[in-house]
Amino acid sequence: MECPFQIKVCVSDRFFAFPYNLVEPQTAVGNRPTENLVVYVPTDADVLYVEKRNFPRFRSVLVYKHEQDYNGNSQSPKKTGAATIVYWNPLVPITEIGAGETRVFSVLLTNNLFYCNTLIVHHENPTCPIEFTYPGLEMQPVCKLLSGARKSVDMRAHAPPLSYSELRPINCELPLAHFKELTESDKFLLCFNLETPTMVKILCLKRIFCIFQYRKLPARYVINLPHEEVDSLYNKLNWARTRRLLRGDIPSNCATVNRASLQYVKDAQTLLHIAKCSQTIVEFVRIFQQLIFPYQIVPIVIVKLNSLNAKSGQTAHENRVRVFCKNDSVAITTAGCVPVNMPDAAPASTFDNTEFDDVAHLKQVANRVAVDGVFTSGVVVHAVRYNYFL
């Protein structure tokens, strides 16, 4: 997939709002700056949130919803040389470019933009939001209170009151209409209309999460969608995050956890008799990260977790317990480090571990873990059983 050189993509978490200061008149024929500006936005509601008066260098400003052009070609887009063209958070392929450089400002690095000339703008030290759930909560009636206001497209004058057990409903398709609430209030019910396309849901969630990052205190939220759909949206956001990493971005400090992973952690808390609350989950992960990464040790509780659903006669070792290091090619197994996607077991004749299987050496490692780590007792260290010549 190709992308025309004239398209310049800038990706930043700050682009939940339109970056007026980054829009400049491009030169047309004869090196004269164009006086016409065309701005393409992702949704009908976003048309209202591009203020034409903020473009004093242009005589004519037109703002349109970016529609799918099935007759166009993103590899050879149509040229409109009489205007400067700008895209804000596009969700469909770009099939029209303007004079000079066509700039794209987006919070998401989508598949359509991945092969373009891309600049990543880093955002340091975000404040990460916290998702929570209400068991058995029927959220749809609360969200329908917002849908009735859709006839009035400009929602900036409408501030929905706090309702239903302290939850504040937010129309996710109009994040900028709720900007003040999202930055100053707490306990949000993020509402989507049933007919909202998946790509719009992904963009809306990303824009809201970007707004949350600029808060002084972490925001707490719940989404009025089935858990399976929320997990799917999170996965797609993680794919966009991976594309940004491939383009030179820095890893994010904010993580999303799907329900299966969360249940895995909760099962571990049960085995260790740890109280179940949000803070102990964070503490649990922090403790075991200090064992896994510096010392390349898989805690026995992870082995037990992987054996909970084992078939009769199957041992924990047969479950292929592995811990994958983020952005690394090495996996940590119950028998030591192996390259990712390599077998867990090797013939005994391929590796002599007597150098490591020494009581004095193992005791020294155990003492180092006890002193430098977070556990003072109960740590048992085994020698590696094979080697892949790492």
Curated annotation (Swiss-Prot):
InterPro entries: AcMNPV_Orf109 (IPR007748). Pfam families: AcMNPV_Ac109. This is Uncharacterized 44.3 kDa protein. It comes from Orgyia pseudotsugata multicapsid polyhedrosis virus.
